[in-house]
Swiss-Prot record:
Record text on subunit structure and interactions: F-type ATPases have 2 components, CF(1) - the catalytic core - and CF(0) - the membrane proton channel. CF(1) has five subunits: alpha(3), beta(3), gamma(1), delta(1), epsilon(1). CF(0) has three main subunits: a, b and c.
E.C. number(s) listed in UniProt: 7.1.2.2
InterPro entries listed in its UniProt record: ATPase_alpha/beta_chains (IPR050053), ATPase_F1/V1/A1_a/bsu_nucl-bd (IPR000194), P-loop_NTPase (IPR027417)
Gene Ontology terms: cellular component: mitochondrial inner membrane; proton-transporting ATP synthase complex
Entry protein name: ATP synthase subunit beta, mitochondrial
Catalysed reactions, as listed in the record: ATP + H2O + 4 H(+)(in) = ADP + phosphate + 5 H(+)(out)
Chief location category: mitochondrion
Known role: Mitochondrial membrane ATP synthase (F(1)F(0) ATP synthase or Complex V) produces ATP from ADP in the presence of a proton gradient across the membrane which is generated by electron transport complexes of the respiratory chain. F-type ATPases consist of two structural domains, F(1) - containing the extramembraneous catalytic core, and F(0) - containing the membrane proton channel, linked together by a central stalk and a peripheral stalk. During catalysis, ATP synthesis in the catalytic domain of F(1) is coupled via a rotary mechanism of the central stalk subunits to proton translocation.
Signal peptide range: none
Amino acid sequence: VLIMELINNVAKAHGGYTVFAGVGERTREGNDLYHEMIESGVISLKDKTSKVALVYGQMNEPPGARARVALTGLTVAEYFRDQEGQDVLLFIDNIFRFTQAGSEVSALLGRIPSAVGYQPTLATDMGTMQERITTTSKGSITSVQAIYVPADDLTDPA
């Protein structure tokens, strides 16, 4: 409900665009969000007034595909900002799954993991992505990122 409210306000009240990047989403969740957006009028199937882009990498996809979803969503947001001159709200759900997918790719490439099992390039990967979320003279990107906490245990190093 909160996501829908924010997307609706950005699109209708402020005239901006929204990009939703679903990293490791369940098919049902992505489908539900899509249909909720149609029902609320955020996505219009009748004309070109929609101001939302949805990018998904399902949880059953290979880690390389899941790792690229957040970056693809960010690239779409950069296009809206730089080419269309729009302010953009970027949702990334879930940033932990982005990190997890990167860790899986790193393991497949034979890289030695860090002390808690993450890829040795985690700080660079995350920093590079976060630094692209910025304001320019043409528009801005504001990001809201959901974080999944494994087993709801904040002390879990995963």
